[in-house]
From Swiss-Prot:
One of its GO terms (molecular function) is FMN binding. It comes from Pseudomonas aeruginosa (strain ATCC 15692 / DSM 22644 / CIP 104116 / JCM 14847 / LMG 12228 / 1C / PRS 101 / PAO1). This is Uncharacterized protein PA3435. Keywords: Electron transport, Flavoprotein, FMN, Transport. Gene3D superfamilies: 3.40.50.360.
Length: 150
C-alpha cells in the first residue's frame, strides 16, 4: 500500500516525526514516502492509497506556512480520495488551550470533506510534556501500520 506522508513544520520537529514515520511504516512493509512541500500535482502523481499527515500548529491554531499551499489546493480541488484511509499526528503545546493541535484539527476537517477515513484517532504530541516526539509516536505508528495492513 502506497502511503503519502505529508508534513507541516515551523521548527522542524514535525518533519523529524514524519521522517521517522516513513522509516517505521516502510519497515512494516508499506510503501511509505515522505513528500515534504509537495504540490497537489506531485501528490496525485504518487497515487496514494493512504495518507499520514504530521503537522505542528502555529499562531492561533493554524497550519504551518509550508503546508498551507497544498492544504488550500486540496480544499479547492477536492481530489477523488473518498474512502482512502488516513491518519493525523498533531504537534502542539497544551499551554495554548483551545488552539492545542489546531493544525491537526484542520487536517481532520479536510479529511472529512474529502471522505478520507481516519483509521485511528489523531495522535496529539504535547511539546510541554515531551522532548522525544518521534519515540512517543512509535506505538501509534505501529497501530496505524497494522490498521492499514488490515
Amino acid at each position: 500500500m502506497k502511503v503519502a506522508i505529508l508534513s507541516g513544520s515551523v521548527y522542524g520537529t514535525a518533519e523529524e516525526v514524519a521522517r521517522h514515520a516513513q522509516k517505521l511504516l516502510s519497515a512494516a512493509g508499506l510503501e511509505a514516502s515522505h513528500l515534504p512541500r509537495a504540490s497537489l500535482d506531485e501528490l496525485k502523481a504518487f497515487a496514494p492509497e493512504a495518507f499520514l499527515v504530521v503537522t505542528s500548529t502555529t499562531g492561533m491554531g493554524e497550519l504551518p506556512d509550508n503546508l498551507q499551499p497544498l492544504y488550500y489546493a486540496i480544499r479547492d480541488q477536492l481530489p477523488a480520495w473518498h474512502g482512502l484511509p488516513g491518519g493525523v499526528i498533531g504537534l502542539g503545546d497544551s499551554s495554548y488551550g483551545d488552539t492545542f493541535c489546531g493544525g491537526g484539527e484542520q487536517v481532520r476537517e479536510l479529511f472529512g470533506e474529502l471522505g478520507v477515513r481516519e483509521v485511528l484517532p489523531m495522535l496529539r504530541l504535547d511539546a510541554s510534556e515531551t522532548v522525544t516526539p518521534e519515540t512517543d509516536a512509535e506505538p501509534w505508528l505501529a497501530e496505524f501500520a497494522a490498521a492499514l495492513k488490515g
